[in-house]
């Protein structure tokens, strides 16, 4: 992000309520499949076979009958139907964060009152029972919800962009992303003033409250985050940023969303 200027206007229209609801239902199936994969680590082969049959004979047909199958990306379709217990670690890691994106969609529909702080994972479990593909009550809540005001969603998108930018900047400082500071400066010498300015402006905008001139994370300055804490911060920001960019129109489909910061 250049001098904290917002991105250009989204190239596509913002998503409608119907589009958000459809994607949320499809993602619910994926989150359920993730739960089965996690449970499979303590299950035997026969139990995993039963779970696989249930996905293929119940979940997939329900998605198809409700015209939701094509709401999933090709990768999601392929991974959803793999035998339970067969996912590679990278697949499990990639899809295990979808509950964060799903929570953003649930929030955008007004079902969740607020998003969690940016160092805290969302817990969608209280409302996941709403997403029963075969449930008779699904139509009732779908007809009763409305998308939040466009300005409120845009504000959340900008906050996500800022937090994702902070994560990427931290990755540069940690040497996880290649970065060459100009004029022979060290990365921290060049990026430090930009970080301080950004944190100050973000505080003025009400996005955060600084700690020692930096973004707050786990009660400390963000720059202190390392290892698991840092990866958690990055994953939260990335998933929310993806969902919010999709909502406001930075991509027609879920898998072609621009994630520039």
Briefly describe each language-model feature range.
Residues 1-261:
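Extended, charge-rich alpha-helical interface modules
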């Amino acid at each position: 992000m250049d001098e904290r200027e917002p991105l250009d206007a989204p190239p596509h229209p913002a998503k409608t309520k119907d589009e958000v609801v459809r994607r949320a239902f499809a993602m619910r199936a994926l989150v359920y499949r993730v739960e089965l994969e996690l449970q499979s680590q303590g299950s035997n082969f026969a139990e995993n076979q039963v779970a696989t049959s249930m996905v293929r004979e119940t979940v997939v047909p329900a998605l198809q009958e409700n015209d939701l199958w094509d709401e999933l990306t090709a990768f999601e379709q392929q991974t959803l139907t793999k035998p339970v217990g067969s996912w590679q670690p990278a697949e499990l890691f990639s899809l295990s964060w979808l509950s964060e994106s799903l929570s953003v969609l649930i929030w955008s529909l007004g079902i969740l009152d607020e998003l969690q702080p940016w160092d805290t994972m969302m817990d969608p479990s209280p409302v996941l029972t709403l997403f029963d593909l075969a449930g008779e009550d699904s139509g009732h809540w779908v007809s009763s919800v409305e998308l939040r005001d466009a300005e409120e969603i845009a504000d959340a998108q900008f906050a996500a962009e800022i937090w994702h930018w902070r994560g990427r900047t931290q990755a540069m400082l940690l040497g996880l992303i290649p970065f060459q500071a100009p004029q022979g400066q060290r990365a921290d010498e060049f990026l430090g003033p930009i970080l301080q300015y950004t944190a100050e402006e973000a505080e003025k905008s009400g996005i955060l409250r600084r700690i020692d001139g930096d973004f707050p994370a786990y009660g400390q300055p963000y720059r202190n985050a390392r290892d698991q804490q840092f990866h958690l911060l990055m994953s939260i920001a990335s998933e929310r940023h993806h969902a919010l960019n999709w909502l406001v129109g930075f991509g027609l489909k879920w898998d072609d969303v621009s994630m520039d910061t």
